A protein has these predicted regions:
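Surface-exposed, short loops/turns at beta-strand junctions within beta-sandwich domains
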Residues: 45-53, 140-148, 235-243
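Short, solvent-exposed loop/linker segments at the N-terminal edge
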Residues: 3-12, 95-107, 190-202, 284-288
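Flexible, low-complexity linkers/stalks enriched in Thr/Pro that connect modular domains
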Residues: 69-94, 164-177, 182-189, 259-277, ...
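Short proline/glycine-enriched turn/loop motifs at strand-loop junctions of beta-rich domains
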Residues: 11, 20-26, 106, 115-121, ...
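Asp-box/BNR beta-propeller loop motif
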Residues: 34-38, 129-133, 224-228
Length: 288
């Protein structure tokens, strides 16, 4: 147990031993299981004791019938596992797509145990290899590197019985995700150039490829040269003439974000000024 001298123990088998009594005297060993209210004779060998509180004393009787008693020895036999309680991650800011998955950018938080057996000793353990090995750690977790962390608490009662909490898993991820490449699917790039994205086409789709698996994608559009951005959909339909900037924001499970390169589209369905055609340098001979 926690103390090596308190005689609170898991040990159910031990012997009574008396030394220094009067030579030739008779010794009677007594035990009480009700805090000394009643006593029963017992043997030197204590074997397979049930959990409980045991008081022991020896009564020494000399040849004349005089008696004396030893001091009482108290033993608490306890083989019951203690309440382990519940381990939580106090102050953890669970960033990202889910607020309950404990995949996070947060590198600083505390371990917190509640509901464990009163008077027990708590040891906090951490594993960084998916539970193959465990090392002792502290309540305060600070400046953690990116990685997968598993935590548990081992609760030890006064008799040395132990129990463990459920494991808490935390994924610390501060790395920006792959944004991938944003393209304009089905865009018909009309006009003089087939690659300048100046077009009469008012209907096309946004398409993102190569982004981090499992990430969340938000598509944004700007119609004021990037000063402000609004969320938009994949399908761009019946656009008015104007300049459109598009980008995709990729958010991973931990809440890290990255942006694609901007795609610029100029929608122009207005007929150009035709101007006036003349015949320059024409020598208009004849009557008129």
């Amino acid at each position: 147990g926690i103390s090596a001298t308190d005689q609170i123990t898991q040990d159910k088998n031990f012997n009574l031993k008396l030394e220094g009594q009067e030579s030739g005297s008779r010794v009677t060993y007594l035990v009480s299981t009700d805090e000394g209210k009643t006593w029963q004779e017992t043997t030197l060998n204590q074997k397979d004791l049930a959990d409980g509180i045991y008081l022991y004393k020896a009564v020494v009787t000399d040849a004349a019938g005089n008696t004396s008693e030893t001091a009482v020895q108290k033993v608490v036999v306890d083989t019951t596992t203690p309440h382990s309680g519940e381990l939580t991650l106090s102050d953890l800011n669970d960033t990202g797509v889910s607020v309950t998955d404990q995949i996070t950018q947060d590198k600083n938080f505390n371990l917190k145990l509640e509901g464990q057996e009163t008077g027990s000793r708590v040891t906090y353990l951490v594993s960084t290899d998916e539970g193959k090995t465990w090392q002792e750690t502290t309540v305060v977790q600070k400046d953690l590197a990116d990685g997968i962390y598993q935590y548990k608490a081992v609760v030890t009662d006064a008799a040395g019985n132990t129990s463990e909490t459920a494991v808490q898993k935390v994924v610390v991820d501060t790395t920006t995700p792959q944004a991938g490449e944003l393209t304009l699917s089905d865009l018909s790039d009309t006009g003089i150039s087939a690659t300048d994205q100046i077009t009469q086409d008012k209907n096309f789709n946004l398409k993102l490829e190569g982004q981090e698996s499992g990430s969340r994608v938000t598509y944004l559009v700007s119609t004021d040269e990037g000063k402000t951005w609004q969320e938009t959909t994949l399908n761009q339909k019946d656009l008015a003439d104007g300049i459109y900037l598009y980008k995709a924001v990729v958010t991973d499970a931990a809440g890290n974000t990255s942006e694609t390169a901007v795609q610029k589209v100029v929608v122009d369905t207005t007929t150009p000024h035709s101007g006036e055609l003349t015949l320059s340098d024409l020598n208009d001979t004849g009557v008129s």
